[in-house]
């Protein structure tokens, strides 16, 4: 904080130099106005940085939470985490609630009913315990996902959300959502969405495809055991 105080102090001394010079007072006044505006924004910048730091801390907390589970693989953001362990036939989903407590959901493979991927709330692929398969993501990969966007999305060439929805046999918590794109609270969030060919979208689709594939395999395994 000390270096900022010195920087602003030097800036206003610089402005004072112009104020004391004939013919340059207008410039000095303009520079002071700009400096005051920047100074007024400083608390908001500090608050935003604290929020970013907190989200990063939350992401790290979720990443290392329940380390004893030793999953085969996991994915986490600052508010959710999904993991699975084939030898235990378990999926675990963790969610950070508003009170910053981590809620843990343990889901046996046999309890996974359905998995679907949606781009901008439009379902592009779905697998179900009933055997229903929709969309072409698993068959055609990321290219199929992009091709499955609506005409309006194609015209806009922007995607705002890539979401995995998992339905399970649990009346207390039957539906879980995993978001693969940055949300509004995250640094770098773009309110307009992200271009379809951007690295952000490609990575989000790769992650979504993988976890959707994991759910597909889990559902098939459970169906074989039930037969």
UniProtKB/Swiss-Prot annotation:
The keyword RNA-binding does not apply. It is a multi-pass membrane protein. GO terms for cellular component: plasma membrane. It is found in: Cell membrane. The gene is yomJ. The chain crosses the membrane at residues 16-36, 131-151. Signal peptide: none annotated. This is SPbeta prophage-derived uncharacterized membrane protein YomJ. Keywords: Cell membrane, Membrane, Transmembrane, Transmembrane helix.
């Amino acid at each position: 904080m000390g270096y900022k105080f010195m920087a602003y102090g030097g800036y206003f001394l610089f402005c004072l130099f112009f104020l004391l010079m004939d013919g340059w007072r207008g410039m000095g006044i303009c520079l002071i106005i700009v400096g005051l505006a920047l100074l007024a924004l400083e608390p908001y910048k500090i608050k935003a940085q604290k929020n970013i730091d907190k989200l990063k801390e939350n992401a790290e907390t979720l990443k290392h939470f329940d380390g004893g589970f030793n999953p085969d693989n996991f994915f986490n953001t600052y508010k959710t985490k999904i993991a699975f362990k084939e030898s235990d036939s378990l999926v675990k989903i963790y969610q950070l609630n508003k009170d910053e407590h981590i809620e843990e959901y343990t889901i046996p493979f046999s309890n996974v009913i359905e998995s679907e991927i949606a781009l901008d709330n439009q379902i592009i692929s779905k697998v179900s315990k009933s055997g229903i398969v929709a969309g072409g993501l698993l068959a055609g990969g990321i290219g199929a996902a992009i091709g499955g966007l609506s005409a309006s999305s194609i015209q806009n060439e922007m995607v705002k959300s890539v979401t995995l929805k998992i339905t399970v046999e649990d009346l207390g918590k039957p539906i879980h959502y995993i978001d693969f794109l940055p949300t509004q609270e995250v640094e770098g969030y773009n309110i307009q969405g992200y271009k379809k060919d951007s690295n952000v979208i490609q990575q989000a689709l790769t992650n979504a495809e993988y976890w959707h594939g994991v759910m597909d395999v889990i559902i098939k395994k459970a169906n074989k055991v039930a037969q």
